[in-house]
A protein has these predicted regions:
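Intrinsic disorder at enzyme termini
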Residues: 473-554
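N-terminal catalytic cores of NTP/NDP-binding nucleotidyl/phosphoryl-transfer enzymes
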Residues: 2-75, 94-109, 114, 131, ...
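Phosphate-backbone binding interfaces of nucleic-acid-interacting proteins
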Residues: 535-655
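Cys/His-rich short segments
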Residues: 115-168, 172
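Beta-strand segments within the central parallel beta-sheet cores of soluble alpha/beta enzyme folds
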Residues: 287-290, 474-476, 579
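Structured secondary-structure scaffolds
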Residues: 1-48, 100-104, 154-369, 411-415
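A glycine-rich helix N-cap at a beta->alpha junction
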Residues: 76-91
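Helix-rich, typically C-terminal accessory recognition domains appended to large enzymatic cores
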Residues: 120, 343-381, 391-499, 612
């Protein structure tokens, strides 16, 4: 019987590139919680996905020479591939470019505007593009973004703003009456003291300085800013409708039981998000947990250095479950954790190869050696058995208690305490000594049965954290993994079962020097590729010949517009010139251009081009020219007409 629903989410990953191991940690942590809850009897719905709008993506797409949609399609697929590689058992992978999400975001924005929570104004301050955050001068830290430490730039634009102060006291009251809402407690104190109690400013919720976003449908020069786009995925992904027609799934699952996010975005999820929900008259999530960061031990990860750690690289070296074990077990509850090649090798060798792998291998090998692989409980119990059984059957309660507070690392420690107790039991009972005395055959059989049963229970408890390893252990012992309830009683392993004849080595020991050498070679190769790509990129960039500066008043004197070439013919007695009739609004201008080596007259007809309209007329090769077509020229002298990205009408002014 189900213990009830459990709806949990991760923050959706920003689709600006391949996620490194620090980004991947959150997905693995969330997966371990989702798997634990499912196994513990809850009806779990686990949602993750990708955040796919914003200026940063627009810029990266332009840099890559693709459309923003093409860019995020590729980036989202790569993120999903990594999540799948790591065994992430999500129920929904949402993308914020999905039509259903975009439609609901527009509805939500309109509803909040209609009820007076959103109004139009203008923004004048500093902006951090990577964080997509606005800041006042007083909020900057040493003149830089207080969140990421990067450079900021001035920003001034028309925008819509959400009146945060309207709901601030209500949120303060909710936090005070629901101490579990923000966890760990240190994150709660930070939000209260640094943001809520000093007072909230209005929040910018639209942008006009870039186009890659969800349009505000009643004012389409604006796009919805990240907060109302990305955060609302938690409700749009399960069928929320702003007009009151939400799905049965939404009614069943909302409010979320857990938002699992990085500590760097705790403010957005514990202040902005609950206030949006209050404005929509929807219940607040039961808990927001801000996990710490996973940092690289030998310094900050940098793509330019070629030393970024990616999950698939680590999997190639260590295997999926070894990477899962490390990121889950080595992360403290509140403080940042560290990952390095040396630490990975150390943990694999000591915990996985020795404590766990060697235990399973020894137990199976002894069963094969002494009893032909048959494991039977002969009832020859001794006092030492009771302590083993107490540790084994008591482990689930300890693990469950740790998981109540999402102390995953501590839960795994409890499970490995079980395995360590099994290893101690081998030392205490000395099966190799018992095997020398035929009179003690029943005692030997009982010892091996107790070990096998203990390992099965341990593997069953380990399943949420290392699912592949747990299944391998069960298969080698010729049994199935247990429910958590079955892990609290001893003796479930069917007496007389036969284990595998050739046990598989779960984790092979690694040589740290060899691993470091291979990793260094990998990073060098990656760095070389990055440098080569940068050189190719630089080859596409020309040094601009600088001319004297002009004033804005000088610039205003020039008039540029879109023109459509309706007729074109070569200029007689010239090998370089073409004479074009260019429609600009209701007027047709004759323009002579030196582009005959690059375009035929036939190719020119029908093109939309950029025109300097008010250039003083002059004669070229005896033919009157009343303007100038704008072209770009590369280092080899190749010309290309400058054309509008979208189909614009002839006469549209260029501003």
């Amino acid at each position: 019987m189900s213990k009830g629903k459990f709806y949990m989410t991760t923050a959706i990953a920003y689709a600006s590139g391949k996620p490194h191991i620090g980004n991947t940690y959150e997905a693995v942590l969330a997966d371990s919680i989702a798997r634990f809850k499912r196994k513990d009897g809850y009806d779990v719905f686990f949602q993750t996905g990708t955040d796919e709008h914003g200026q940063k993506i627009e810029l990266k797409a332009a840099e890559a020479g693709v459309t923003p949609q093409e860019y995020v399609d590729k980036a989202s697929a790569e993120i999903k591939r990594i999540w799948d590689l790591m065994g992430t058992s999500y129920d929904k992978f949402i993308r914020t470019t999905e039509p259903d999400h975009e439609k609901q975001v527009q509805k939500i924005f309109k509803r909040l505007y209609d009820q007076g929570d959103i109004s139009k104004g203008s923004y004048d301050g500093m902006y951090c593009t990577p964080c997509e955050s606005f800041w006042t001068q007083s909020q900057l830290k040493d003149g830089k973004c207080p969140d990421c430490g990067r450079e900021v730039k001035p920003a001034k634009e028309e925008a819509y703003f959400f009146r945060m102060s309207k709901y601030a006291q209500r949120l303060i009251d909710h936090i005070n009456s629901h101490p579990e809402f923000i966890q760990p407690v240190s994150r709660k104190n930070e939000m209260m003291n640094n943001f809520l109690l000093p007072g909230l400013q209005d929040l910018c919720v639209s942008r006009t300085s870039f186009k890659w976003g969800i349009p505000v449908d009643f004012d389409e020069k604006h796009v919805v800013y990240v907060w109302l786009d990305a955060l609302t995925n938690y409700i749009t992904g399960i069928g929320y409708d702003a007009e009151g027609n939400s799905s049965e799934q939404y009614k069943k699952l909302w409010p979320a039981d857990l938002h699992l996010i990085g500590k760097d975005i705790i403010r957005f999820h514990t202040i902005y998000w609950p206030i949006f929900l209050m404005a929509l008259n929807e219940p607040l999530p039961k808990q927001v947990f801000g996990h710490p960061w996973l940092l690289q031990g030998d310094g900050k990860m940098s793509k330019s250095k070629g030393n970024v750690l990616y999950a698939d690289d680590l999997v190639d070296f260590f295997g999926v479950d070894a990477v899962r074990y490390f990121v889950l077990h080595e992360m403290p509850f509140e403080n940042d954790g560290v990952i390095s090649w040396e630490l990975m090798v150390e943990r694999l060798n000591s915990d996985l190869a020795n404590t766990l792998g060697n235990l399973v291998n020894r137990t199976i090998s002894m069963s094969n050696k002494y009893f032909g692989g048959v494991v039977a409980d002969k009832g020859a119990a001794e006092a030492v058995d009771e302590d083993l059984k107490a540790v084994v059957t008591g482990t689930y309660d300890k693990v469950a208690a740790k998981m109540e507070g999402w102390r995953v690392a501590d839960a795994i420690t409890d499970i490995f305490t079980l395995f360590k107790r099994c290893n101690k039991y081998i030392d205490e009972t000395e099966p190799w000594v018992l095997a020398k005395d035929p009179a003690k055959a029943d005692r030997l059989a009982t010892v091996l049965y107790n070990l096998t049963e203990s390992i099965v229970i341990g593997a069953s408890l380990l399943e949420p954290y290392m699912p592949g390893t747990a299944e391998k252990i069960a298969a080698q012992l010729n049994t199935s993994l247990r429910s958590f309830e079955e892990c609290t009683t001893f003796g479930g392993y069917i007496s007389g079962s036969k284990v595998t004849e050739k046990p598989e080595i779960l984790f092979a020991r690694l040589d740290v020097k060899e691993v470091l050498e291979k990793a260094a070679a990998m990073f060098e190769a990656r760095k070389a590729l990055a440098e080569e790509a940068e050189e190719e990129k630089e080859e596409d960039v020309m040094e601009l010949t600088k001319k004297p500066e002009i004033t804005f008043e000088d610039f205003e004197k020039m008039q540029f517009a879109v023109g459509e070439i309706i007729k074109c013919e070569p200029v007689p007695k010239s090998k370089k010139l073409l004479c074009s009739q260019v429609k600009i609004g209701k007027e047709v201008k004759q323009i002579v251009s030196g582009i005959r080596a690059h375009y035929t007259a036939e190719e020119m007809v029908g093109k939309k081009v950029m025109v300097l309209v008010n250039l003083k007329p002059a004669k070229l090769a005896g033919v009157l020219s009343e303007g100038m077509l704008l072209c770009a020229e590369d280092a080899e002298g190749n010309l290309a007409l400058v054309t509008p990205e979208k189909n614009m009408p002839a006469g549209a002014e260029i501003c």
